[in-house]
Every structure is written in structure tokens, then in C-alpha cells.
Amino acid sequence: MGWIRRRTWMAWLGFLLLLAAGVFLVVIVRRQQRSIPMPDESMVELAVEHEGTTYRLVNGDLYRVASPDRLVFVEKLYDKDFREKNYTKQDGQVFRVDTDTGKRYPTRRHLEEGFENADQITELIGAGRGWTAFTLQSSSTPSVPEYVRLRNRILRGESKFVDNRVEPSSEIVHTGTRALKCYSLPPTPKMICAKASLSTELLYFVKGDDVWFSGWYFIPEGGMPFTLMDLETTWVKEHPGMRIMIEDGAAMFELKWATKPKYRQPKASRVRIPVGRWVHLKACFHLSEMPDGRVRLWQDGDKLIDQQGQTLPLAGAIYDSLEIGISAHSFGPNPATVYVDDVAISD
């Protein structure tokens, strides 16, 4: 019986070796299939070097330069056909198409919100007011599936807030009787950031547009949020775009993409964001993937930033998303609270 066991063991060993060899060959073939010849420069959307490695973006796919005449696939950053699949135009109006139902929603190039006539976050969500989602990322819901699941349960009336909150409030208002209150716990050491924000994905801004944003913010004493506003494209991985950040207590811009260009106030005359009172932030972005873009920032009527530089990740990108509130909380161990009121975005 021992020889039978030995023969069986040897047969299994042979099978495993063949299986391993087959897997190895499949991996090699796949790797070969996922490389392409070096394309013409006119087809390259982005060329960037990171930690000694050069990358090229071609038709939405990111490649590593493996040799002077060969690119190796790294990952897909966006679907090159996203525009055709998700947008249609009729009588001059651009519509966003729900690919599951076929329903069309008119995109917006103008949105104003004072948060009046709303007592719950669910009353702000929908095509009528133009907001499409809210994000509650915390230690209780650190991953995307977890906070999406919580959001859906809140929208269905099956759950209440767990810790982070986004809701209309009468506690502190700029005008009227309501403002948006955003409250976020600090992120845990394993999290990049926490969030408590309101967003829409019905915008439509493209290269060449001038996008104006205005909002009133009240930050109480305590934790300071990292970002107050994000203008993003959700069609590209990681949702790159322009954002208003707070660095060393002062407002600044960053294009969250590739080398992350930043636009700061002059150091000698830097004006901090006030705490404990309302402050008005107004911004204008001239959209371009080239250095001829432009950013401007006013705080309480005073122009603090006016610089040229890249403001769009890619020439064909569509800024479809505006996120307001605590779009990122990364500073310190304290919770952060932000009140937002009288928000507007337009061309």
C-alpha cells in the first residue's frame, strides 16, 4: 500500500507542478498581452515620472515605459468612452444618462443653495434641488462600501447617523433660517481622512470654461478641517480635481492629480481663515490641462490668490462633481464642525 501512496503523491506533485507551470505561462502571456508598442506622442495624454519610473497615459490606460519602444500596462484610469456612454445632448442641453435605467437628467452649469425649507438631509437629495449624495466616512464606516451602505440606509429611512453627520441646521446660519451643518470625527491612524460632506454629480464644466464658486463658512473653535470644497471629475480613478484646502490656517488651492500643483497665498501677506465667525470664500477657475489655466481666490472680498497653472487633470475631463462641507478631515485628534450657507457655482 505504501507504493500506492507514493505513486499517488508523485501524481499529485506532477499535477501541481504542471498547474504551477500553466499559471506561470498564463501570467507571462497576460503580461505580454498587456504591453503595447510606444505610441505616437500625439496619442499620449499624460507623461509623468515618479520615483525614477516614467509613465504614459494612453486612451485612459496608464502604462510604464519598459523600453524605448514598449509600454507595459499598469492600470485603467478611466473609460475612454465615458462621454458617449453617460451623456447625450438635445436642443443645446446636455443630459447625464443613468446607464441602468436609461433615464436622463439635465446637467447643471448653475446651482445655488441656501438650505432653506429642509429639516433632514434626505430632503436635499434629488434632481429637484440638484444634490445627489452625501458622504459619512468615519471609523465606523471607513471604506467606500461601508459608507455607501450607511448612506443608502439613511435615504431609505432605515438608519440614523452613526457618528459623522451632514444635515440642515438652525443653530448657526448666515441668512434665512437654515445652514448645512457638517460634523466629522477625526480619522483613525489607518485612515487617510474622514468626511462629512454633501455633493452633486450633475455639473458639466469642461476645458475653456470659467467656473465661479461662492460659499459662506463658519468654523467653530476646535478641530480644523483639511478641505472645504472639491470640484472633481468622477469619471477618472480617485476623482481628481481642484479643491480649496486649509494649510497652516490659510486657504489655498490644489489640483489633486499627478504632481498635485498647489496655489498658495504669498507667504508674507498670508491671511488665515477666521474661527468663530462667518467667512466668505469666492473662487474662479479657468479650466485647462495646460499651464495657461488660472485660479483666483477672494476671502471676505479681498483677493488673496491670482495665479496661472494647470486646473484640469486632462483635456477631455468633465468636472461633474461639487463636494462641500468637510470633504476631508485630516488634522489632529479633535472632531471638526463646519457650517456652510449660501453656496453657488456657475459659469
Q: Which stretches of residues belong to each language-model region?
A:
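Hydrophobic alpha-helical membrane-insertion segments, chiefly the h-region
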Residues: L19-V29
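Low-complexity, Ser/Thr/Pro/Gly-rich disordered linker/stalk regions
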Residues: P37-P39, M43, Q93, D100-D347
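Ser/Thr/Pro/Gly-rich low-complexity linker/stalk segments immediately outside membranes or between
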Residues: V29-A47
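Short linear proline/tyrosine/threonine-rich motifs used for host-factor recruitment
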Residues: T54-V58, L62-V65, L71-K76, E84-K89, ...
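N-terminal Sec-pathway targeting helices
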Residues: G2-L18
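Short acidic-hydrophobic surface loop/beta-edge motif
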Residues: I36, L46-H50, R56-V58, Y87-T88, ...
